[in-house]
């Protein structure tokens, strides 16, 4: 039987249990998403964010996305890449789906909501994907979803490709 999923927006008013689940899911998906050093770090990201969703299956959080708008005080080098190039944008800081729930259309469902949010506000969507270590599934997914590669950057310990749609 195929699991039932519900997608819900969330903010800093999410419950401690929900935040813990999101934190745990984030940490389980590193290095595909950046590691968070504490729950306080997650709460800080959420306070800086503009639009967030989590996915429930049988009352368990199995996916999430955290997005920022332009003008945030977020200090990520990747966020700054887009801040220096775009006047308005919706930045996908991190998205993760629990392994057993991948390839079931959840990524497309989450992005359908993000596309609607961006369209309603006339915003391009900006994000980066790791190329070192290589996150091939994410590269393929975002290219399939219509994102265009607009740049690359090498850091000391990793490299990323930048995308806009």
Which role fits each region the language model picked out?
Residues 118-131:
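Conserved GNAT acetyl-CoA-binding A-motif
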Residues 132-151:
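Conserved active-site alpha-helix within GNAT-family acetyltransferase domains
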Residues 152-165:
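C-terminal "cap" of GNAT-fold acetyltransferases
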Residues 97, 103-116, 144:
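Conserved acetyl-CoA-binding loop-helix of GNAT-fold acetyltransferases
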Residues 1-40, 60-62:
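Short amphipathic alpha-helix that is part of the acyltransferase structural core
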Residues 50-69:
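Conserved beta-hairpin
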Residues 93-103, 131-132:
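A short, internal acetyl-CoA/4′-phosphopantetheine-binding micro-motif in the GNAT/acyltransferase core
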Residues 66-94:
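Conserved acyl-donor/pantetheine-binding loop and adjacent beta-alpha core of acyl/acetyltransferases
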